[in-house]
C-alpha cells in the first residue's frame, strides 16, 4: 500500500507559529526540535526537572526553561521527548494536571500511547511528529535549509485539527522540506521496536559477537577477528545506507559478493525468520512492553545485569585496545576519561 506523503506546500507554518510549544526533554531530539521551532518563529519553552544538567545548556542557547509542570501549564502544544520509560510518570505528575481544552499532546515515538501507558483526556489532540534521523542531523539539515524525512500520526483528534497541526510542527523543524509520511501510532511503534530488536541492535550485535567467538575459538587472533566482523561493518553499512543492498554488492569485490550470496542464507535461514516473527509477535502483543515496564519498576535490575554481561564480552576488551590505534575514531567519554 502506497504511503501518503506531504511536503512544504502541504503545511501551513502559521498554525504552529500561533501556538505555544513546550518541549519536554532536551536530549538529542529535544535540542533539535526546540532550536528549529524557535528559528521558525515559534514560541518555545523547555521542560526539565530541577537539577537537570541540560538546563544550563538550554539557557545558554537562549531558550526559556521551566519544570515540566510549569511549561505544560503555559503551553497549548506539548511535545514529549523524554525517554520512553520516564514519559508515563512525567505525564501523570506534571502534564495531565495542566491539560486544558484545545491542548495538543505530541510525541516523537508512539510506545506510551500505543500500549496505553499514557491515556490522554478526550478533549486533547494526541499526535506524533518523528524525524527519521538523530537530533544532530535534524538540526544540521534545518540550518542548511534542508530537512530530514519525518513521520506524523494522529491518535486522538477531538477538534479535527490534528493533521494540520502535526504538519505545521513538522514544517517548523524542516521535515516537510524532505517529505513527511503519514502513519499510525501502531505502525510506527511496532516497526520501530522490531527494527531495533531483530536487526539494528539485537540482531546485528549478536551476529558480530558470534562471528568474533567463532574466529577466536578457531585459533585466529582476537585482533584479526575484531577487524573482520566489527570494524569493517561500518564500510558495508555506509554503502547500504547510501544506495541500498545493490550498491553494496556492486562496490565490494566479486569474491565478497559471491561468498555473501552462498553463505548469508546459511547464517540467516528459515528458522531465523520464524524466530524474528516470534519477536514481532511479542512486540505486537505488548509482552515486550510489559517486560520493559517491569524492569523499570524493579529499579532497572534486569537491564543493568544485561549491560554488565555485555560489557564483559572479550570483543569489548579487544576493541578498546585497537581503537587506541585509530586517531580518526571519535572515542566515547567512557574510554577517554
UniProtKB/Swiss-Prot annotation:
Q: Which cofactor does it need?
A: Mg(2+)
The note on the cofactor says: Binds 2 magnesium ions per subunit.
GO CC annotations on file: cytosol
Binding of Mg(2+) 1, residues:
192, 196
Describe which pathway this protein belongs to, using the record's wording: Amino-acid biosynthesis; L-isoleucine biosynthesis; L-isoleucine from 2-oxobutanoate: step 2/4; Amino-acid biosynthesis; L-valine biosynthesis; L-valine from pyruvate: step 2/4
Pfam families noted in UniProt: KARI_C, KARI_N
Entry similarity comment: Belongs to the ketol-acid reductoisomerase family.
Give the catalysed reaction(s), semicolon-separated: (2R)-2,3-dihydroxy-3-methylbutanoate + NADP(+) = (2S)-2-acetolactate + NADPH + H(+); (2R,3R)-2,3-dihydroxy-3-methylpentanoate + NADP(+) = (S)-2-ethyl-2-hydroxy-3-oxobutanoate + NADPH + H(+)
Q: What is its EC number?
A: 1.1.1.86
Which positions are annotated as binding NADP(+)? 26-29, 49, 52, 54, 84-87, 135
Does the record bear Repeat in its keywords? Answer: no
Q: What's its job?
A: Involved in the biosynthesis of branched-chain amino acids (BCAA). Catalyzes an alkyl-migration followed by a ketol-acid reduction of (S)-2-acetolactate (S2AL) to yield (R)-2,3-dihydroxy-isovalerate. In the isomerase reaction, S2AL is rearranged via a Mg-dependent methyl migration to produce 3-hydroxy-3-methyl-2-ketobutyrate (HMKB). In the reductase reaction, this 2-ketoacid undergoes a metal-dependent reduction by NADPH to yield (R)-2,3-dihydroxy-isovalerate.
Q: What is this protein called?
A: Ketol-acid reductoisomerase (NADP(+))
Q: Which residues form the KARI N-terminal Rossmann domain?
A: 3-183
| Domain annotation KARI C-terminal knotted: ranges | 184-329
GO molecular function: any one?
magnesium ion binding
Class of this enzyme = oxidoreductase
**Alphabetized UniProt keyword annotations:** Amino-acid biosynthesis, Branched-chain amino acid biosynthesis, Magnesium, Metal-binding, NADP, Oxidoreductase
Where is substrate annotated to bind? Answer: 253
Its domain of life reads Bacteria
Q: Does the keyword Magnesium apply?
A: yes
For biological process, the GO terms are: isoleucine biosynthetic process; L-valine biosynthetic process
Q: Provide the residue positions that the database annotates as binding Mg(2+) 2.
A: 192, 228, 232
Amino acid at each position: 500500500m502506497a504511503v501518503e506523503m506531504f511536503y512544504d506546500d502541504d503545511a501551513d507554518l502559521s498554525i504552529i507559529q500561533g501556538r505555544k510549544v513546550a518541549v519536554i526533554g532536551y536530549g538529542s531530539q529535544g535540542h533539535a526540535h526546540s532550536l528549529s521551532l524557535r528559528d521558525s518563529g515559534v514560541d518555545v519553552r523547555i521542560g526539565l526537572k530541577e537539577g537537570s544538567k541540560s538546563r544550563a545548556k538550554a539557557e545558554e542557547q537562549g531558550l526559556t526553561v521551566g519544570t515540566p509542570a510549569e511549561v505544560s501549564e503555559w503551553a497549548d502544544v506539548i511535545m514529549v521527548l523524554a525517554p520512553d520509560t520516564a514519559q508515563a510518570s512525567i505525564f501523570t505528575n506534571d502534564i495531565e494536571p495542566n491539560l486544558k481544552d484545545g491542548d495538543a499532546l505530541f510525541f516523537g515515538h508512539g510506545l506510551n500511547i500505543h500500549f496505553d501507558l499514557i491515556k490522554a483526556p478526550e478533549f486533547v489532540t494526541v499526535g506524533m511528529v518523528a524525524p527519521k534521523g538523530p537530533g544532530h542531523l535534524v538540526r544540521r539539515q534545518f540550518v542548511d535549509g534542508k530537512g530530514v524525512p519525518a513521520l506524523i500520526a494522529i491518535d486522538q483528534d477531538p477538534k479535527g485539527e490534528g493533521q494540520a497541526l502535526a504538519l505545521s510542527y513538522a514544517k517548523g523543524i524542516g521535515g516537510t522540506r524532505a517529505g513527511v509520511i503519514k502513519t499510525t501510532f501502531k505502525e510506527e511503534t511496532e516497526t520501530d521496536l522490531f527494527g531495533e530488536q531483530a536487526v539494528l541492535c539485537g540482531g546485528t550485535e549478536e551476529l558480530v559477537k558470534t562471528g568474533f567467538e567463532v574466529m577466536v575459538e578457531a585459533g585466529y587472533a582476537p585482533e584479526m577477528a575484531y577487524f573482520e566482523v566489527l570494524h569493517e561493518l561500518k564500510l558495508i553499512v555506509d554503502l547500504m545506507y547510501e544506495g541500498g543492498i545493490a550498491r553494496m554488492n556492486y562496490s565490494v569485490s566479486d569474491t565478497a559478493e559471491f561468498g555473501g550470496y552462498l553463505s548469508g542464507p546459511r547464517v540467516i535461514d528459515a528458522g531465523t525468520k520464524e524466530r524474528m516473527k516470534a519477536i514481532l509477535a511479542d512486540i505486537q502483543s505488548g509482552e515486550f512492553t510489559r517486560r520493559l515496564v517491569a524492569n523499570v519498576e524493579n529499579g532497572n535490575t534486569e537491564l543493568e545485569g544485561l549491560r554488565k554481561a555485555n560489557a564483559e564480552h572479550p570483543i569489548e576488551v579487544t576493541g578498546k585496545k585497537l581503537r587506541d590505534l585509530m586517531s580518526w575514531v571519535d572515542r566515547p567519554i567512557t574510554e577517554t576519561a
